[in-house]
Amino acid sequence: MTVLKMTDLDLKGKRVLIREDLNVPVKDGQVQSDARIKAALPTLKLALEKGAAVMVCSHLGRPTEGEFSAENSLKPVAEYLSKALGREVPLLADYLDGVEVKAGDLVLFENVRFNKGEKKNADELAQKYAALCDVFVMDAFGTAHRAEGSTHGVARFAKVAAAGPLLAAELDALGKALGNPARPMAAIVAGSKVSTKLDVLNSLAGICDQLIVGGGIANTFLAAAGHKVGKSLYEADLVETAKAIAAKVKVPLPVDVVVAKEFAESAVATVKAIAEVADDDMILDIGPQTAAQFAELLKTSKTILWNGPVGVFEFDQFGEGTRTLANAIADSAAFSIAGGGDTLAAIDKYGIAERISYISTGGGAFLEFVEGKVLPAVEILEQRAKG
């Protein structure tokens, strides 16, 4: 994968437009979770150090396109950036017809989704973005799977289009895990439904040596192996699909599980052997014996890809399985990559962020890359690099 990289470019005195993913939760005008902004800061600082006139753009939320809405304004993000960078970061609402930014200064453009044609990737809007800059930098992996004006269109028309450090690191890490992984490779794919992760499961079945499944997905695989799953969430119509996947790759199944009679924070957790699951039981986590077996498997792996907690870890009594596996991944010498919103929440909860080799910031983009799909915003950077 060959793309121009921002780190290799001379940006002194250049007008540089950087697309970041600053789509953060905001409540009462305050940023609630700053992970995405923190991830973007090194790129912004580097562009300033290189002497560029820096313009930053992003979307936030899902406003009606073409209309301003205060709740989706990037104002709280501009205020956060001002504090984080120790300088005033002006928020510019009217920028499409040109702005004055001096070298060494940084401005934030208002939500790109307030512009008509952003989501449709309209040429006219993309050309306006491109006219603002000498260099366009795509640094928002989380939106790379969408062909929109500020992620794809602008890269078609800009004089120079490059990948930012965050995007480049993400592509390198995913390429390392999926392109030519050190073996043995284990993947953990968990979630409520096989149907939503079907392409991921099929893709990984052709790459990894062990495919650990969790959550509702595991229940469908258990049913496919002839086990009773009680009133647990599973997909009867995908039992044959689960069998086909299990025929292609080793899918170790739980030998014991944690069950409850109801899905609630107050539910009483009971550990049972898989053969003892009753008709009115709901499987909400893997059992301790299974967790220990899976942990051993992870410790001997050389590459680990993790997407999804294996139990309802939000309730502590159903979180032991996820905690055990999270710690096993953290303790492993393997190259480990983790992605997906729930996975990141589990990493936070168990305090292991520093011990995972790479944490992906992109939810949908991460999954689409794992599925082997082309990410439009990356594809256009590759095309531009070829000239």
Curated annotation (Swiss-Prot):
The keyword Electron transport does not apply. It is found in: Cytoplasm. It is an enzyme of class 2 (transferase). InterPro entries: Phosphoglycerate_kinase (IPR001576), Phosphoglycerate_kinase_CS (IPR015911), Phosphoglycerate_kinase_N (IPR015824), Phosphoglycerate_kinase_sf (IPR036043). Belongs to the phosphoglycerate kinase family. The gene is pgk. The keyword ATP-binding applies. Keywords: ATP-binding, Cytoplasm, Glycolysis, Kinase, Nucleotide-binding, Transferase. Substrate binds at D21, L22, N23, R36, H59, L60, G61, R62, R113, R146. PANTHER family: PHOSPHOGLYCERATE KINASE (PTHR11406), PHOSPHOGLYCERATE KINASE 1, CHLOROPLASTIC-RELATED (PTHR11406:SF23). Pathway: Carbohydrate degradation; glycolysis; pyruvate from D-glyceraldehyde 3-phosphate: step 2/5. Its main location: cytoplasm. ATP binds at K197, E314, G340, G341, D342, T343. Coiled coil: none annotated. Monomer. One of its GO terms (biological process) is gluconeogenesis. One of its GO terms (molecular function) is ATP binding. GO terms for cellular component: cytosol. HAMAP family: Phosphoglyc_kinase. Its EC number is 2.7.2.3. This is Phosphoglycerate kinase. It comes from the Bacteria. It catalyses: (2R)-3-phosphoglycerate + ATP = (2R)-3-phospho-glyceroyl phosphate + ADP.
